[in-house]
Amino acid sequence: MIPTLIATFGLASGLAITYYLFKSPNPPELDLQKWWGSGSPVAVVDTSIRPFKIEFNYTMIKDLKERLHNRRTFTKPLQGIQSEYGINTIYLETVLDYWVEDYDFKKRADLLNMFPHYKTNIQGLDIHFIRVKPDVEDVEVLPLLMLHGWPSSSKEFDKVIPMLTRPRVGYNFVFEVIAADLPGYGFSEGTNKPGLNPVQIGVIMRNLMMRLGFEKFYIQAGDWGSQCATHMATLFPEQVLGLHTNMPLSSKPVSTLKLILGALVPRLAVDRKYADRIYPLKNLFSYLLRESGYFHIQATKPDTIGVALTDSPSGLAAYIIEKMAICSSRIELDTPHGGLQHLDLDDVLDTVTITWMNNCIVTSMRLYAEGFALPEVQTVHDIPTYVPTAAINFLYEVIYQPDWILRDKFKNLVRSTVIESGGHFAAMQTPNLLTDDIFDSAVEFLKFHEKNKRIRDQNY
């Protein structure tokens, strides 16, 4: 009797675990017009699309430079230490001096304004976006929504937009690019209401594209933008024609189990050439433990650290620069720059300046807290997406997952590329490689839809 009971319990437990690991829940019920603006929804919604120009105004610049000039003396690094304890404050001094003396605010604003900028109100929030239409004839134009992550903005894409909107030999299509600032980032308005998580941002971005007249479109995204885009592909598969991501990630429970099981026989779990990107797991966990302190703070107490970062441009620069450096090359802690040399300093200071002038560091960091606060996020994570997906994995991306794990979430992974260089801010660091992969991925998306069309036609 006892052995039978034990066997029955074991079988039941196994079935329960299997169900949990492989379950595909129903999508959450979402209000697709949920109001995120101040107060209650307005009776008449402003649907206008307004031209917008970026200006680094004199008052902001004067105040910023005064604060930088009056900064306190920083504590020097320990003897023999470069960036192992965080940003090298001697190096930081040179960056701040450059920001005050040599960073050309007008020139940088003019460069950003080479693209048409707009704002429109979506669900109570003014959303900023760049929209560049290609000047072409006899070439198919594919609408492409581009979404960034933290601590970035649509500025991140200023190197790739010109390449994406120009025809290239061997391709019979080009892109119309819509690069949007996530709510609370860059020039997009943040909310004063809790709950604006990546799922809800996905709804906002879908509504933005519909406002612009796109019923169907493609998406390219990284970091938090990739999370929002993945949720869009999951929830709106009839509208998202293809998803290209430079931070591919499956957050399903079975994916975590596979990651752990793969540690037992790494050569069976991942191509031997790339095994050291995730195995041995102790190295991965050591890296994540070393570099994820900011993540935990922002996911729990963003408003507290936000006080210091809002009040001090030196502190804001140090905080953002250190993370941009490590995510561009994690192996250069023994240098003063900590990895920042792989990015153009003016691009980095554009990001810091945009964050400072819009006072949006707190509203951007809150996404870390919101991303884990509501069960609807994990629910959508657990639902597979059948939208054709392309993944590109740069060398120093935060985390790498092999295709056999990615397919837990992305059932139609039509292209997967592994790059032996680059990092998290791909559009800034390796714009040519990213652009090439977007074009090649679009070829696969078009093939996927043509094949499905032939199958449908044969069945009628």
Give, region by region, the residue ranges found by the protein language model.
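Conserved hydrolase catalytic core segment
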Residues: 3-4, 17-20, 163-174, 212-274
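C-terminal subdomain of alpha/beta-hydrolase-fold enzymes, centered on the catalytic histidine
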Residues: 13, 17, 298-460
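Non-catalytic accessory segments flanking enzyme active sites
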Residues: 60-133, 359, 363-377
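Terminal signal-anchor or tail-anchor transmembrane helices
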Residues: 1-29
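Short, contiguous pre-domain boundary segments
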Residues: 36-50, 71-74
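Glycine-rich "HGGG/HGxG" loop immediately N-terminal to the catalytic nucleophile
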Residues: 105-107, 155, 182-196, 230
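Conserved HGGG/HGGXW glycine-rich cap/lid loop of the alpha/beta-hydrolase fold
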Residues: 137-187, 442
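Alpha/beta-hydrolase active-site loop
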Residues: 193-211
